[in-house]
Amino acid sequence: MTERLVDLMDRTFSATEREVIYRLIRSRRDIRQFAPDPIPPETLLRVLEAAHHAPSVGFMQPWNFILITSPRLRAQIKALFEEINEGEAHRVADQSRQQLYRSLKLEGLMESPLNIAVTCDRRRGAPFVLGRTPVPDTDVYSTCLAIQNMWLAACAEGIGIGWVSILDYGKVERLLGMPAGVQLIAYLCIGFPREFRARPMLEEVGWRSRMQLDGLIFQDCWGQPCPWLSRESVASDENEQP
């Protein structure tokens, strides 16, 4: 019991430490503009260690990280992006919005000093992974948690990450020689950013606005508001405290 209490005390974070975490979450951005400076290996290893400490279903740890440095390979992936991106632009019916879409920089494949493909080995731990059978995609969700850990750690190191989703992931998997049963989850550009925006780029340019949290919280069933957990109610309770 004493050892357990000591452990709990060690896990108590100061107000300053808590604020650092929240600041990281609020300031994280999807980066597209990169400086060419390489990431020091010891820094990159720390970032990947953070990813590797993510929670995973049944402690499956389904992730792998393919570091892509080959200019030829990255040029092939850039060509895939350009093909898909042109098709996506044509899907935007409104002409002014299509023009806005075409003006956006949505990748840093060649500019960033490193690309990383994050994969999910869906065979790992087979034939039985504790907790996965009822929801088979929990291995994919686990890999996404590793990506979030990686992103926040990178942000803490002053490093930017950009997730490139405008790709044919099946073609990328073949380019990377990935075996059957291993799925590409994220293709990331990573490096020191030329800038950190105050707000997400898509919010700044007017593509989308951040939704109000109050409208996203329900109680007991879909669509039923949770009046006691709104900004207004919490602020009112704080003001009433002596």
Indicate residue ranges for each PLM-predicted region.
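A glycine-rich helix N-cap at a beta->alpha junction
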Residues: 85-94, 177-200
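Short alpha-helical scaffolding segments that buttress acidic/His motifs in well-ordered protein cores
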Residues: 25, 47-51, 188
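Glycine-rich phosphate/pyrophosphate-binding beta-alpha loops
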Residues: 53-58
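C-terminal helix-cap and adjacent tail motif
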Residues: 2-13, 17, 187-242
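Short acidic N-proximal helix/loop "leader" segments that mark the beginning
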Residues: 1-46
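Small-aliphatic-rich amphipathic alpha-helix that forms the alpha element of a beta-alpha
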Residues: 47, 51-52, 116, 124-175
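Glycine/small-residue-rich phosphate/adenosyl-binding loop
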Residues: 61-143
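Short secondary-structure boundary segments
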Residues: 120, 166, 192
